Swiss-Prot record:
PANTHER family: CYTOCHROME C OXIDASE SUBUNIT 2, CYTOCHROME C OXIDASE, SUBUNIT II. Gene3D superfamilies: 1.10.287.90, Cupredoxins - blue copper proteins. NCBIfam families: CoxB. Mg(2+) binds at residue 198. This is Cytochrome c oxidase subunit 2. Belongs to the cytochrome c oxidase subunit 2 family. Cu cation A2 binds at residues 196, 198, 200, 204.
Length: 227
């Protein structure tokens, strides 16, 4: 989860988020090299006293500055497209969770089981227990198994919302009348926090998301207690 004065990403807890972190580092390194080259050329232009008054064209330079940017864009685009398809691809999900956004709470439905649905509201600050996080705790947490592919079906009943859990690399818009799909698979147990990431009204800041990822055995025990 996030911590005060954090400048980087949250720790990755899913294969998708790990890929996103690798892609971020890959792109950042390319940007660093380009920026260094530009600064080097600018410093040369400011310090050199050499002048070429008879230069009319430079075919070699024009060829290089056309091909090189194209190659750099390809180096960025290929891993980006790979991750994009990974995020959308889900063939055999072990579980399906339907999420509906409301003003200003979330409702969840485990579609593989009958009558397993609940609403999730933010816990007021006055009701927080010691150790709980202000504006991030909810009255009903979403419990899911680890190391299993979960298909998220996300929509809204009123306005635009966005269901986001940074540690898992999930951010999907909840659009009224449209059912969006996302893939979720946690690589380790834990409690993961998120929030609505689309301005949706006066209480937009009070729509937290809490996922409790547990081993399959504990998930089955939780299911039995809920059914």
């Amino acid at each position: 989860m996030a911590y005060p004065v954090q400048l980087g990403f949250q720790d990755a807890a899913s294969p998708i988020m790990e890929e996103l972190l690798y892609f971020h580092d890959h792109t950042l390194m390319i940007m660093f090299l380009i920026s260094s080259l530009v600064l080097y050329i600018i410093s040369l232009m400011l310090t050199t006293e050499l002048m070429h008054t008879n230069t009319m064209d430079a075919q070699e330079v024009e060829t290089v500055w056309t091909i090189l940017p194209a190659a750099i864009l390809i180096l960025i685009a290929l891993p980006s497209l790979r991750i994009l398809y990974m995020m959308d691809e889900i063939t055999t999900p072990s579980l399906t969770l339907k999420t509906m956004g409301h003003q200003w709470y979330w409702s969840y439905e485990y579609t593989d089981y009958e009558d397993l649905c609940f609403d999730s509201y933010m816990t007021p600050s006055s009701d927080l227990k010691p150790g709980e996080l202000r504006l991030l705790e909810v009255d009903n947490r979403v419990v899911l198994p680890t190391e299993l592919a979960v298909r998220m079906l996300i929509s809204s009943e009123d306005v635009l919302h966005s269901w986001t859990v940074p540690s898992l690399g999930v951010k999907t818009d909840a659009i009224p009348g449209r059912l969006n799909q996302a893939t979720l698979m946690a690589s380790r147990p834990g409690v993961y926090y998120g929030q609505c990431s689309e301005i949706c009204g006066a209480n937009h800041s009070f729509m937290p998301i809490v996922l409790e990822l547990v081993p399959l055995k504990h998930f089955e025990e939780w299911l039995l207690s809920m059914l």
